[in-house]
């Protein structure tokens, strides 16, 4: 939700257009633009040689990743940050194993041969060709305070990402989000002109995802937590542009507070 525009709704492509085409591939983003969807969310990690790349998970996902011989990978612990970009190019992420849990979820996703994990620079170059005034790019920086050696430091990640953003001249079209608010603190301190969105997850019964919202949480960059549903006040105090909560955490009270702020 964009706090300053309570009646504002925008249609986004999530990880490109993963319902129809392989997620986070250049072809998926091209497909969005061809269908007049001019806003998207995507994910950024860093390769071993410090190149920002477009991929969601810290590790290669066996459900849609094949090796250079065309076989599904079986190793679930191939860390993106352990591989150079040239090594990442050996993998094909253009098809979906329909027997996997992910594959059963997106049964209509088409296969595209020889799809590689793109660089952030490639995606921004593609996006710069979209002259729509409604272009909006949500870059989620994937970072975690809970596990070391999956990424550079938050400051290093932010500088690497912003180097590419500044080259693109798309600064006014970009909002940067993260569950790891340490990265957003770095953006605030180093690049205050860039819009920031704060991702959150509040524990729900029966869902095995770690809660990121609690007093002095490392996910929240150790900011004090006011009250359970007053995240908008915390974000406003940081000069943030938006709250991006887990969809099942959205309540009327949360929306009302957001609009008041």
Stretches with model-predicted labels:
Residues 1-261:
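Phosphate-group recognition and catalysis centered on beta-loop-alpha active-site segments
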